[in-house]
Amino acid sequence: MMATQTLSIDSYQDGQQMQVVTELKTEQDPNCSDPDAEGVSPPPIESQTPMDADKQAIYRHPLFPLLALLFEKCEQSTQGSEGTTSASFDVDIENFVRKQEKDGKPFFCEDPETDNLMVKAIQVLRIHLLELEKVNELCKDFCSRYIACLKTKMNSETLLSGEPGSPYSPVQSQQIQSAITGTLSPQGIVVPASALQQGNVTMATVAGGTVYQPVTVVTPQGQVVTQALSPGTIRIQNSQLQLQLNQDLSILHQEDGSSKNKRGVLPKHATNVMRSWLFQHIGHPYPTEDEKKQIAAQTNLTLLQVNNWFINARRRILQPMLDSSCSETPKTKKKPAQNRPVQRFWPDSLASGVAQATPSELAMSEGAVVTITTPVNMNVDSLQSLSSDGATLAVQQVMMAGQSEDESVDSTEDEGGALAPTHISGLVLENSDSLQ
């Protein structure tokens, strides 16, 4: 395969370069000189295009073998070849320079534009090769980390499963530890005394409650030291471990029970404390963060539970109280305007008499003067303007005074059953004088 082949500058000789040019059937560029040309150029082709001429100039350039070699290295690096590096290309450049100097061949042609194109193309491919090398290093680093993580996980699973063939199985571990410390009781856990004095001990347990992994000591300075088992060891009985395990399980059960209680209905003591605070601060029932922490400490609840309780209390306790208090207060309703009938305060004869009477004035004592001007063409509809409270009161007083005075002066008018229209104006004037 191409990815496994080793490339060198020798694989791009002038014979292959000439073969490429011959296969393309292009003629030599007059601006570039071929070092191996014998001075005989092929006959010019009339159908040659500028693109073909540019291709021929590139293939005839002295730096073309180096460009082709770099391009092949980039392809191999893209395919994942491990032998392609930027350092190897530096060696290839040195070999190319030595070979060109040894053969006496030039590095450039007589066309500066083509020379500049070749140099920039080599630079671009070199940068591309460096970037591919960085990507390859990152991939290798990721693969190594991933493999190490898998190995660690597999070792831990093998250690916990206690397979007979694994290096951490009880049989294998007993043989290793017996070779170091003699005999080892399978009922206990072996811990070196020096490890307990220096720092924490990292141990791994397997089925049966026995530790078979070598002891790793973590010093107070953070250094990890692995120590071999020594004869002076401390044996911890399985009964003590079982007791410790039972205590841990009981603590876990208690925590689970307390968490379940908190998730359900809150304790009555907690609700009483929060309810009392709510009614004490009913004007502004929004506790601060410090107050929430204090309430949570008193009620043995979390801040989230306290916050949720106050949110629900403001909506379910305070809001119904406010709604009920607002419903008890009497609501003032605007009285609709009523169309009072024309003959509510006076008979038909009085209304017809007022319509034909001359203008008159009504005056009340104590400065409250009500002036009523009644033109001759006043109709019944215009009397509706007198239906206000002040005008109605004045008309009632005038009528009552006129009726009392009329009864004392002349009793013959009562027999007619109605007041004469001609006496209305005089009655109104006399009553107004008497009121003054």
UniProtKB/Swiss-Prot annotation:
Pfam families: Homeobox_KN, Meis_PKNOX_N
Assembly information from the UniProt record: Interacts with MN1.
PROSITE patterns to which the protein is assigned, alphabetical: HOMEOBOX_2 (PS50071)
Family, per entry: Belongs to the TALE/MEIS homeobox family.
GO molecular function, one term: chromatin binding
Keyword terms: Activator, DNA-binding, Homeobox, Nucleus, Phosphoprotein, Transcription, Transcription regulation
Protein name as annotated: Homeobox protein PKNOX1
Extent of Acidic residues compositional bias: 404-416
Region of interest (Disordered), ranges: 23-50, 401-436
InterPro entries for this protein: HD, Homeodomain-like_sf, KN_HD, PKNOX/Meis_N, TALE_homeobox
GO CC term, one of those recorded: nucleoplasm
Residues recorded with modification Phosphoserine: S33, S41
Subcellular location(s) per record: Nucleus
Function: Activates transcription in the presence of PBX1A and HOXA1.
Domain of life: Eukaryota
Key word Transcription present: yes
Biological process, per Gene Ontology: angiogenesis; camera-type eye development; erythrocyte differentiation; hemopoiesis; positive regulation of DNA-templated transcription; positive regulation of transcription by RNA polymerase II; regulation of transcription by RNA polymerase II; T cell differentiation
DNA-binding region, residues: 259-321
The species this protein was found in: Mus musculus (Mouse)
MEIS N-terminal domain residues: 80-163
